[in-house]
């Protein structure tokens, strides 16, 4: 195929910009077009002159190279470069990549009516409010102000009205009243980059504030992952009435109090609020006038105002007929004669709670407050929870100020016994060293004993330090409340001993840092102590880019998954067991069951098939002996496109059954990717510590390995059949082998049965050569099942797929990803991982095509194959036989039905070329392709 005409972009897309001094800055495309024109003219001239064939061929080659450079300069062996030595950007470069036409201009657009500024906290705001600077308000709401000025006849025409708004030196006072009126019913969207999940964009009612900073409610910081150390946020104004209504219904901050990833509260009572509430609810012994009896709470408040008692005085008071909680989870007993022993501070705290949550008669730490918000969401709903959170915020800030709690260097002191403890530890270390030099212990034993000596010494110093600390002092109050990340370990490092440190590989260094920050550290101690911090900084920097790329791939895979039907009618389900949940690091299977739909009835508790497992239902299960529950899952959903409501279950962000049109694939991708930067980059090595599996890959690299289905570095050999283990050693090579023989009682390798029927049966056998240095996990004569690992290591999901099938591979991927997240303290619902794994296992390959139109080895969507087989069977033909295929994220994203979506992901030029060659048709059904052509996306929110 020969091109006789090449496309020329409009001048607006390859501008020529005049510079000072008569020079011009032009687009690289102009240079490439110029080269094509110049060489094309040379070929024309040589043809007219009837030049020799050799010269013509050379000129044609140069013309071909110029055309190649114009279309795709980056993939040439020697790309054409500009004056700075950088390759010139060709037509392909303008379309592909992060700054290409698709990702920069089509899928991501800049918008008008937006602003950006630094954020600061404002304790006076309500949860649904934010503060915008006056200058920003005037600019954002300028069209609305101009309309009001014209309607009220304050300006003769639009030009005069615009001048009134833009006159910032001496603004007309009437503007402020009109601005308040305009802003009263308008919501603005606040966005903090990076926008890792849906809670990074929320709607607020804007109020006008002085200064240049945006003011933010302190409780929404955790949802935005924001703090007030210089963070910036963007403001966007929805213009139409429909956009305002949608923002109020879906994005308002008081309607987004649950995390979509886990269902936990997205608002967080923290820091000063926690400190103030803990101080308010403390019960300090020995206070003045303790034991007084009051008729009701108001009488106790009068006594507080008169100075007869204080906040922490233990008193007896009558309360209404309410449930009494003396401690967290202590039951719902009602006090006798409605009299309780409490403090005035606790009366004030409970006065801020709804009646259904009273009476909390214990000190409120950060963990207690988090559970209180969870209970409030369950019992009272989002609107009441937002009001309660605002009241607790005000109360906490007030009493954090009233408490006068502060922290000074004089609050800590070095325990006198420290030097004696260290001297004793040094003597023990010398004994261990002498024993080692005498050859009586090994290096590993020496290492272990040194660690034990210094661990005991550190604990002894900690005990002395804790005994000397005032239990009611400022420092102890800060630690007990949980207001900060500081625990007693940090106090020990301040005035006791820093202790043992770990090197960047994760191994404990057997030489401790004996100093503390109060006395000061030696140079070498500071260097050792800082090694962990250096590792943390490097991990965070490397994690950010890798985590962002992982999130992008997850989103690409999940884009095609949304709720498309009410019920797919499947009878299949996923079995959840208590043992499996414990292996993932969970205390029970409650969190995994929450929000699911039963696939099989639970006759023990009278639950029918199809029952929605709400919090009330799930909380009843621990009282029974049920250890396994079969539930509907995205993995077993039979909807040919998307997922049905019953297989997905509850939308964790709302607590209700998921709505049709919800983009559950994008929500799943955001839920998995958002905590990605919290995962470590570390690979732990054995280094003297016994470890059966050798090096263990954890954190983000392990998550990437699982989602990309890479072969593990230390892959465990697994049995492909059921049978009996026979361990042998090859005498010639010395290599240890494991033979797995099925139906051992009928095989010739064992004594045959009396009827000699062994010779009539075919014995299946597999032989595995074991790699040296790997720990054997099976014994001679042991009966094992298919999929059992023979040596220590990491299982390969593709081996599981070929040996045990699709369900086993899917369960393994879900459990392994969850194990990584749970190890870092991140809770994530299984259904999000199941949605992504469903897409990874969506395809099959044709093994026997039968009477279908498929090709051998062709990769097809499994639901498409089921439809083809059903049609062929109805016609009396032979169906196709297929086997499942497990794709990594990158491969799965490229297998999308839409070539527009695939081209905007990566390999743009290759995807577009293949689509053109095959004449592919895009039906414009998904999110990205609809955005590209300007249609509405197929989701309800």
What is each stretch, according to the model?
Residues 1-200, 205-206, 352-360, 644-647:
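Extended, highly charged clamp/arch subdomains and adjacent linkers
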Residues 2-18, 36-39, 60-74, 83-100, ...:
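Core structural elements
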Residues 3, 8, 102, 198-207, ...:
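Flexible, glycine/threonine-enriched loop-and-boundary segments that flank and lead into catalytic domains
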Residues 12-20, 26-27, 109, 113-127, ...:
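Amphipathic alpha-helical/coiled-coil segments positioned at domain termini
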Residues 15-17, 21-22, 45-48, 404-438, ...:
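Short His/Asp/Glu-rich catalytic/ion-coordination signatures at enzyme active sites or charged loops
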Residues 101-103, 146-149, 160-165, 169-172, ...:
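Intrinsically disordered, low-complexity regulatory segments
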Residues 177-194, 444-498:
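Gly/Pro-rich turn-and-neighbor structural signature
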Residues 209-216, 221-230, 237-242, 247-248, ...:
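Conserved catalytic core of nucleotide polymerization and phosphodiester-bond processing enzymes
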């Amino acid at each position: 195929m020969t091109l006789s005409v090449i496309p020329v972009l409009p001048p607006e897309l390859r501008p020529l910009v005049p510079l000072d001094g008569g020079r011009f800055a032009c687009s690289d495309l102009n240079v490439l077009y110029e080269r094509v024109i110049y060489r094309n003219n040379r070929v024309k001239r040589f043809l007219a002159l009837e030049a020799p064939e050799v010269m013509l061929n050379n000129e044609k080659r140069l013309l071909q190279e110029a055309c190649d450079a114009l279309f795709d300069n980056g993939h040439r062996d020697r790309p054409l470069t500009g004056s700075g030595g950088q390759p010139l950007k060709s037509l392909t470069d303008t379309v592909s990549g992060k700054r290409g036409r698709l990702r920069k201009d089509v899928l991501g657009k800049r918008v008008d009516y937006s602003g950006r500024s630094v954020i600061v906290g404002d304790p006076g705001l309500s949860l649904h409010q934010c503060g915008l600077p006056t200058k920003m308000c005037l600019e954002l709401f300028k069209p609305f102000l101009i309309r009001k000025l014209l309607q009220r006849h304050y300006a003769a025409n639009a030009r005069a009205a615009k001048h009134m708004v833009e006159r910032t030196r001496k603004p007309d006072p009437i503007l402020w009243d009109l601005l308040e009126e305009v802003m009263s019913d308008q919501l603005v969207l606040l966005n903090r980059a990076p926008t890792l999940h849906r809670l990074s964009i929320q709607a607020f009612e804007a109020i006008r504030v002085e200064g240049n900073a945006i003011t933010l409610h302190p409780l929404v910081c955790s949802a935005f992952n924001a703090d007030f150390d210089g963070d910036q946020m963007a403001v966007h104004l929805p213009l139409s009435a429909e956009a305002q209504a949608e923002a109020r219904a879906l994005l308002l901050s008081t309607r987004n109090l649950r995390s979509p990833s886990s269902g936990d509260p997205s608002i967080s009572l923290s820091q000063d609020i926690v400190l103030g509430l803990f101080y308010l609810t403390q019960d300090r012994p020995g206070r003045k006038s303790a034991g007084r009896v009051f008729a009701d709470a108001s009488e106790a408040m009068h006594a507080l105002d008169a100075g007869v008692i204080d906040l922490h005085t233990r008193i007896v008071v009558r309360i209404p007929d309410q449930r009494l909680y003396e401690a967290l989870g202590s039951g719902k007993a009602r006090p006798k004669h409605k009299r309780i022993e409490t403090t005035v501070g606790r009366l004030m705290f409970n006065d801020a709670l709804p009646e259904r949550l009273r009476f909390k008669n214990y000190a409120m730490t950060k963990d207690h407050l988090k559970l209180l918000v969870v209970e409030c969401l369950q019992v009272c709903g989002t609107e009441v929870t937002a009001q309660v959170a605002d009241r607790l915020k005000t109360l906490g800030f007030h009493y954090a100020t009233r408490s006068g709690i502060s922290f000074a260097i004089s609050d800590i002191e070095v325990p006198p016994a420290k030097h004696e403890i260290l001297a004793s530890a040094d003597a023990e270390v010398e004994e261990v060293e002498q024993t080692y030099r005498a050859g009586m212990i090994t290096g590993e034993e020496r290492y272990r004993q040194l660690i034990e000596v210094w661990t005991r010494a550190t604990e002894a110093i900690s005990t002395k330090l804790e005994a000397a600390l005032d239990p009611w002092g400022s420092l102890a109050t800060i630690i007990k409340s949980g207001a900060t990340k500081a625990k007693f370990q940090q106090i020990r490092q301040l005035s006791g001993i820093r202790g043992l440190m770990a090197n960047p590989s994760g191994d404990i260094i057997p030489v401790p840092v004996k100093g503390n920050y109060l006395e000061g550290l030696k140079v070498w101690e500071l260097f050792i102590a800082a090694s962990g911090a250096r590792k943390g900084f490097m991990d965070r920097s490397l994690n950010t880019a890798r985590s962002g790329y992982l999130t992008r791939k997850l989103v690409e895979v999940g884009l095609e998954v949304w709720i498309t039907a009410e019920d797919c009618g499947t009878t299949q389900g996923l079995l959840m067991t208590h043992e499996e949940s414990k292996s993932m690091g969970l205390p029970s299977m409650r969190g995994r069951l929450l929000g699911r739909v039963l696939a099989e009835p639970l006759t023990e508790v009278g639950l029918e098939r199809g029952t929605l497992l709400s919090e009330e239902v799930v909380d009843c299960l621990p009282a029974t002996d049920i250890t396994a529950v079969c539930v509907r899952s995205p993995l077993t959903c039979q909807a040919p496109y998307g997922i049905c409501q019953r297989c997905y279950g509850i939308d964790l962000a709302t607590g209700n059954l998921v709505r049709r049109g919800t983009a559950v694939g994008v929500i799943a991708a955001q839920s998995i990717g958002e905590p990605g930067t919290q995962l470590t980059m570390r690979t732990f090595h054995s280094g003297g510590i016994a470890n059966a599996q050798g090096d263990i890959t954890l954190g983000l690299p392990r998550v990437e390995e699982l989602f990309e289905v890479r072969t593990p570095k230390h892959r465990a050999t697994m049995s492909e059949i059921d049978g009996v283990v026979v361990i042998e050693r090859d005498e010639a090579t010395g290599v240890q082998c494991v033979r797995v023989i099925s139906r051992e009682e009928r095989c010739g390798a064992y004594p045959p049965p009396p009827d000699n029927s062994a010779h009539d049966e075919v014995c299946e056998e597999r032989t595995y050569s074991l790699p040296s240095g790997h720990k054997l996990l099976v014994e001679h004569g042991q009966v094992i099942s298919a999929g059992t690992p023979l040596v220590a290591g990491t299982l390969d999901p593709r081996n599981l797929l070929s040996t045990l099938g699709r369900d086993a591979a899917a369960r393994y991927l879900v459990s392994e990803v969850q194990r990584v997240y749970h190890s870092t303290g991140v809770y994530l619902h299984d259904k999000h991982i199941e949605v992504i794994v469903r897409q990874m296992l969506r395809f099959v390959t044709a093994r026997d095509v039968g009477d279908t139109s498929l090709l051998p080895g062709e990769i097809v969507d499994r639901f498409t194959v089921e439809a083809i087989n059903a049609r062929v069977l109805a016609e009396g033909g032979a169906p196709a036989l297929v086997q499942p295929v497990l794709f990594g994220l990158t491969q799965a994203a490229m297998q999308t039905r839409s070539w527009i979506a695939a081209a905007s992901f990566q390999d743009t030029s290759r995807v577009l070329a293949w689509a053109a060659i095959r004449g592919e048709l895009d039906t414009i059904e998904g999110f990205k392709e609809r955005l590209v052509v300007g249609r509405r996306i197929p989701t309800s929110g």
